[in-house]
Amino acid sequence: MNNQKKYHLFDVLIYAILLALAFLFQSTSILFKYNSPAPSLVLALVLIISFYENYWFSAIFGLISGILLDIISVNGVGFHALTYMLTGIICSSVMKRYLQNNFASFAVISIPVVIIHQFAEILYSSGFDLGIITLFLKYYLIVAIYTFASAFVLYIIFRYTLKRSERFVKPKGIINKK
């Protein structure tokens, strides 16, 4: 096995551990009170991964992440899997074609994606009820703001960790294909 494949397998292992931690913190009340708005950490992780990987990997990661959420979700099967997969594909494609990987680009992409995802979630779970705007403003907008904040913090940590690992761990001549 060559060095490039070893490092990609190591990245996949790190992503799996991060997904397990994000899923654990999101689905339990370890950090947040029960039935209070909490950030969608898995969505934040899908956004971050889509900034660093190609669109196929981002789509598969989004699909697996969504399937995990659909298993415990009351909204029905398939919603999170489909939306997270599309999030991975679209964000990664836009990132690779039109933007540079920096904090401003992350903000430009993640803010509309999180708002659209939260609005789609409320439409899927509640239908087209008249109280949908009130519910969005009272609960889902707070979730979106928490998700923005957690995504930005995770992005900064991820970017710093990635720079340090490339500088100290990977031998010279190894280039990540993205």
For each of these PLM feature ranges, what is it?
Residues 1-178:
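Terminal, non-globular segments
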